[in-house]
Each structure stands twice: as C-alpha cells, then as structure tokens.
Amino acid sequence: MATAWCLPWTLRRAGAWLLTPPLRCPRRALHKQADGTEFQSIYSLDKLYPESRGSDTAWKVPDDAQQTNKDIPLDRLTISYCRSSGPGGQNVNKVNSKAEVRFHLATAEWIAEPVRQKMAIMHKNKINRSGELILTSECSRYQFRNLADCLQKIRDMIAEASQTPKEPSKEDAALHRIRIENMNRERLRKKRIHSAIKTGRRVDMD
C-alpha cells in the first residue's frame, strides 16, 4: 500500500539537510452526482410514501387528531396497541404497532339507537360478553395508520347500518312473487316424488 505522504531528502545545503515540502499523493476523487440523478430503488421511502418526505414524523399522531375525527369521539373509545403479526420485518418484534379499538355499543349515544341495534345484529361476532364492539387493524407498521383504519371501519359499519332498504317497484314485487310460487311448486313436486318412493318400498316389503 502506497504511503499517503512522500518525504524525499534533498541535497545538503549549508551544512544542513533540507526537506522538501510534503507532497500529497493523488487520491481518487469522489464526485457527487447532481441533484435528481442519484439512483433510487423502487422500494425507497420517497416512492412508497411520497407525502412523508423521508421523515417518520408524518405518521405520528397530530396534535389536532380529535379535531379531524369529530364524527367519532375518541374520548369514548378504548384504544390500545400490541405486537403485530403483519408487515414490518424485525420492526414488529420491537414496537407495538397493532391497534385495537373498543367501545360499549349499547351506551354509545353518538350513534343513533336504530343504527346501534342494527349494528349489534350485523356484527354480533365482534361484540364480547361485556357488550363492547372490538375492532383491530395491523395493515401497516405505523400505529397511527392502523388507528385510522379502525376508525374507518367504524364509519363503514355506521354507514352500512344506516342504509334503509328501498321499496321494491311493482315489476320487482311481481317477479319476486313468481319466483316464490315456482319455488313452492318445485318443493311440493319433490315431496310427492319422495313420498311415492317410500310408499313403493313399503309395498315391496309386504
């Protein structure tokens, strides 16, 4: 390996040895590429999350989080986080990114009573013995995104339970009646065939 400093001795002058000024050996220059020309992977954070601008602060809970969720009172929800089994690699073993949101459905005054009753029927498998509706999300490695997904699920449930069935038109009602009559006619035909088969078996045994 060549030394970085070259110290050659010069000729002796006036009874003393003179040293030449140190010379730095040439090194490979590192040229920085122009802005916008550097290589970026398709999986870089700037491309996966263009709004983050390379910073994790974009996924932190903002100070005005309650103002952006006026339709769902966060103070009436029980929010907790735990280990996630979703995407994130080693990150899932270090942070609690899985979000769990629960609230007591029967006493949620911010939801209309008919809507609550319909939600209790439609989502009875998500209600525990205490009457709490439990929602979880682990679609992301960030807590705030999983919390936002749980809140969106609540909005979707409320919107689905708030829909009123449309009154069928005369044509649809007539078609529905014809289908029911055909189903009953086919059911009776199969019963008569089955009864005739059983009667034939009893005659053969006698």
From Swiss-Prot:
Provide the disulphide bond pattern: none
| Organism lineage string | Eukaryota, Metazoa, Chordata, Craniata, Vertebrata
Q: Which family does it belong to?
A: Belongs to the prokaryotic/mitochondrial release factor family. Mitochondrion-specific ribosomal protein mL62 subfamily.
Protein's name according to its UniProt entry: Large ribosomal subunit protein mL62
Q: Which GO terms describe its molecular function?
A: peptidyl-tRNA hydrolase activity; translation release factor activity, codon nonspecific
Q: Which PANTHER family match?
A: LARGE RIBOSOMAL SUBUNIT PROTEIN ML62, PEPTIDE CHAIN RELEASE FACTOR
Catalyses which reaction(s): an N-acyl-L-alpha-aminoacyl-tRNA + H2O = an N-acyl-L-amino acid + a tRNA + H(+)
Q: Name one Pfam family in it.
A: RF-1
Q: Where is the transit peptide?
A: 1-29
Q: Which Gene3D superfamilies match?
A: 3.30.160.20
InterPro entries under this entry?
Answer: Mito_Release_Factor_mL62 (IPR052104), Pep_chain_release_fac_I (IPR000352)
Give a GO cellular-component term: mitochondrial large ribosomal subunit
What is the scientific name of the source organism? Ailuropoda melanoleuca
Q: Lipid metabolism: is it a keyword of this entry?
A: no
Q: Which keywords does this chain's UniProt record carry?
A: Hydrolase, Mitochondrion, Protein biosynthesis, Ribonucleoprotein, Ribosomal protein, Transit peptide
Instruction: Report the subcellular localization.
Output: Mitochondrion
Q: What EC number(s) does the entry state?
A: 3.1.1.29
Mostly located where?
A: mitochondrion
Set out the biological process GO terms recorded for this chain's protein: mitochondrial translational termination
Q: Which superkingdom heads the taxonomic lineage of this protein's source?
A: Eukaryota
Q: What does this protein do?
A: Essential peptidyl-tRNA hydrolase component of the mitochondrial large ribosomal subunit. Acts as a codon-independent translation release factor that has lost all stop codon specificity and directs the termination of translation in mitochondrion, possibly in case of abortive elongation. May be involved in the hydrolysis of peptidyl-tRNAs that have been prematurely terminated and thus in the recycling of stalled mitochondrial ribosomes.
EC class name: hydrolase
The UniProt subunit note reads as follows: Component of the mitochondrial 39S ribosomal subunit.
